[in-house]
């Protein structure tokens, strides 16, 4: 009877029973037997699963079929408690998701590459913020844009439109004729190599040149007082203002946003040439003033003062010469009239009985009187020149 019950229990519990441990000794104490029934040994961990008791041991202890089935159900419940929350095996990195995930994708269930932690679509390293993939060469050759529109541009390939040279920030880029033949990369390089040159700049207009200098008015002429014959005096001519000669360097001005700079350059150049003309006129005037050392250094103030004194002296000298000529003519007329009267008196029949030449003056007396007049005039002229000589020796 006992053998049949053992065979029936063994066929019912083939899939669920564990490997039996060696049987305990029958002469063990009663506390040991109660511990074996509960499946926990002394010193074992409290959370460790209880050891399975073999069916033969249960039959030996005299337990019935109902007790064996209850024991079996208890073992199944204990095995279910050992699995924590998920039935599938999970890796330590995927503690919140039941599907197996790679360690780099802790927040998303779809497998992603390590470089794309925020976006699921695969991106290249150059497109960091979810842009369409671009090649490294297309990062600088996109489209002809101004320097202000450097951000937020649409992607373009290398074979796009050639770039224009943005060499001038004040004006829009100038369209340059590019040859139709040749690869597009060479055309882009040629357009990038454009420098600031007269051919690349805007054409010069006549208004810019006339703003600095007159086109038909030189700053000086060949027949001016400074460059002309020293015998002529330009200050007495009708055109007293000296003409200007052209400067050594003419600055060509194109259209630009700097009118103040252009006006300052023009003013400085005009003042420089005016000062040169004034200095040249003073140098010519200094040559005309007689001084005791001929090469004496004089300031502009001294040159002007000596020139005024010299002009006054020359004017007075001309007046004296004119007065002297008038006196000579008057004296000659008076002497002729006196001689005629004397001759008439001498030749007249009513003359005195004495000698005819007693009362008539001799020719020597007329020469002595003329010499006295000449000496008096020379003394007056010498006195007029004395102040000029004293001032010239300073």
Curated annotation (Swiss-Prot):
Induction of synthesis: By bmp-signaling in the ventral mesoderm. Inhibition by fgf regulates the timing of hematopoiesis.
GO molecular function, one term: DNA-binding transcription factor activity
Localization annotation: Nucleus
Residue ranges with Basic and acidic residues bias: 1-17, 367-377
Protein's UniProt keywords contain Iron: no
Cellular component, GO annotation: nucleus
Major subcellular site: nucleus
UniProt-listed CDD domains: bHLH_TS_TAL1
GO biological process: erythrocyte differentiation; hemopoiesis; regulation of transcription by RNA polymerase II
Pfam families named in the record: HLH
Tissue distribution of the protein: First expressed in patches on the ventral side of the embryo in a region that will give rise to hematopoietic tissue. By late neurula stages, expressed throughout the ventral blood island region. By tailbud stages, expression extends to probable vascular progenitor cells, but is excluded from the presumptive liver anlage. Also expressed in the central nervous system at the tailbud stage.
Region feature 7 X 7 AA approximate repeats of [TS]-E-L-C-R-[AP]-P, mapped onto this chain: 83-173
Sequence repeat segments: 83-89, 94-100, 105-111, 116-122, 127-133, 149-155, 167-173
The UniProt record lists the keyword Transferase: no
Keywords for this protein: Developmental protein, Differentiation, DNA-binding, Nucleus, Repeat, Transcription, Transcription regulation
Chain intervals for the UniProt region annotation (Disordered): 1-49, 347-394
Domain bHLH as annotated: residue spans: 262-314
Function field: Transcription factor that acts synergistically with lmo2 and gata1 to specify embryonic dorsal mesoderm to a hematopoietic fate.
Protein name: T-cell acute lymphocytic leukemia protein 1
Organism: Xenopus laevis
């Amino acid at each position: 009877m006992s053998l049949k019950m053992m065979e029936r229990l063994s066929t019912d519990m083939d899939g669920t029973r564990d490997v039996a441990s060696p049987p305990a000794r029958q002469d063990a104490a009663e506390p040991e037997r109660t511990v074996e029934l509960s499946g926990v040994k002394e010193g074992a961990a409290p959370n460790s699963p209880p050891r399975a008791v073999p069916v033969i041991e249960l039959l030996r202890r005299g337990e019935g079929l109902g007790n064996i089935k209850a024991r079996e159900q208890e073992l199944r419940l204990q095995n279910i408690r050992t699995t924590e929350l998920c039935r599938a095996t999970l890796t330590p990195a995927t503690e919140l998701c039941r599907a197996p995930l790679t360690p780099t994708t802790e927040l998303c269930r779809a497998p992603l590459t390590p470089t794309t932690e925020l976006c699921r679509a695969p991106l290249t390293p150059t497109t960091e913020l979810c842009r369409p993939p671009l090649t490294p060469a297309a990062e600088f050759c996109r489209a002809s844009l101004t320097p202000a529109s450097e951000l937020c541009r649409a992607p373009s390939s290398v074979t796009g439109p050639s770039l224009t040279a943005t060499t001038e920030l004040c004006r829009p880029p100038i369209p340059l004729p590019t040859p139709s033949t040749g690869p597009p990369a060479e055309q882009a390089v040629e357009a990038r190599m454009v420098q600031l040159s007269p051919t690349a700049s805007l054409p010069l207009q006549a208004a810019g040149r006339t703003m600095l200098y007159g086109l038909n008015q030189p700053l000086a002429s060949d027949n001016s007082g400074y460059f002309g014959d020293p015998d002529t005096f330009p200050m007495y001519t009708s055109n007293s203002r000296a003409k200007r000669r052209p400067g050594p360097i003419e600055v060509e001005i194109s259209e630009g946003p700097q009118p103040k700079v252009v006006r300052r350059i023009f003013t400085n150049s005009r003042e420089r040439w005016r000062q040169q003309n004034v200095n040249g006129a003073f140098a010519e005037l200094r040559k005309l003033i007689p001084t005791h050392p001929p090469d004496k250094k004089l300031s502009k103030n001294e040159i002007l003062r000596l020139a005024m004194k010299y002009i006054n002296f020359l004017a007075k000298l001309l007046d004296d010469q004119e007065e002297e000529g008038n006196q000579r003519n008057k004296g000659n007329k008076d002497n002729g009239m006196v001689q005629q009267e004397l001759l008439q008196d001498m030749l007249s029949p009513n003359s005195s009985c004495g000698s005819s030449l007693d009362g008539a003056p001799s020719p020597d007396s007329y020469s002595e009187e003329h010499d006295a007049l000449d000496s008096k005039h020379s003394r007056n002229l010498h006195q007029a020149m004395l102040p000029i000589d004293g001032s010239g020796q300073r």
